[in-house]
Amino acid sequence: MMDEAKEFDAVSLGILWDRLVSITDEIESTLVRTSFSTIVSESYDLTVVVLDREGRLVAQGSHSIPVFIGTAPRTLKYMLQKFPPETLMPGDVICTNDPWMGTGHMFDISVMRPVFSTAKGTLLGYTMSITHLPDVGGIGFGAAASEIYHEGLRLPIVKLAESGVINEFLLDLIAVNVRTPESTIGDLRANIACNEVGGRQLVEFMNEYAIDDLSALSNAIRNQSELAMREKIKDIRNGTYDNSILIEAIDEPITLSCKVEVEDEKIEIDFDGTGGCVSRGINVPFCYTNAMSLYSIKCLTIPNLPNNEGAARPISVSAPEGCLLNAQPPFPTGARHAIGHFVPGLIFGALEEAAADKIQADNGMIDLLTVQGTHPDGRPISTIHFVSGGFGALHGLDGRDCLPGPSNMAAVPVEIWESITGMSVI
């Protein structure tokens, strides 16, 4: 259901909307330029968002990867349960890497900063960045863990800074639990810095256009996105469609199943029939399954529309609790992408007859090389190299090469990889 919204003419709404997206892109640029790890600075395993005072996603950075679609509002709700809006102060920064409150595994850190009016001191909204950390301790990145506790340091919702003062105890605690404290702490500070830049730019934007409350603009943007999504869903033939695939797991193959119901201007996706969780780190929390599902439908409908919460409203996603695509603690989730990346192909397979001219062929998927150890000069190493198989072909179009489908991260240049690891690529 759409929210009540102030009327904006099309030109004004377009200008204001673009400005908000440009703010997220500036946050992203700051994050990339100040980060220490190549997984952020080269591979762009990240997202940045602006949310309104009610915690609704208004704008998301242009380079955000699909697995982060829709996760920030959910994470913010958990954060505000712990630290209610009326208790927040300028300069507060809140973070968590909990897989079930964040993005599905502990290697992603979600960092949020509330934004306040400089004139009145009132809460205007929030900025949030999410990045894959180079290391979180534990067994390391991969599927080897048999419990979530093996995978590293799991942070509850906690203040990374309070009233502008960084929580040095928290940084020290993290530093002594990871293999690469310099790059890990450096990336955390980059998250703090980019959110500060984003907050400042959001205040300047609202002052420039005499906007006291972001909610009206937020409602207009999200309503427009919802209308666009509903109109495009109408192009998909009504009906109930299903698909199942058998994939390699750890000890034995496992089934992924989905049912997609298209009714006029809405879509329901259900993963009932999917196999259960396993004792290795390929289990997928629902937040990840939901993100991959939203991404799949967006690819078929309005791929060029900037991400916001409105476009997700006509789409509902469900998965039985305890199945592989709705894993619960203490199942490990470190390599949840190994299963989660099958979700778009599963959905596309179900809809191959209903939207044949829009369906994408299977992706080349993504392979990861994780390196942990010691550089020849004595420095500790914990880094990831993406091997990208490319995107599947579309109707009348070849697939894109060297992209880690279904994602939009970038491979680290060989020269940089050799420099940071001391290894040679032949």
PLM region spans:
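Glycine/proline-enriched, intrinsically flexible loops and inter-domain linkers
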Residues: 2-90, 95-119, 123-268, 272-426
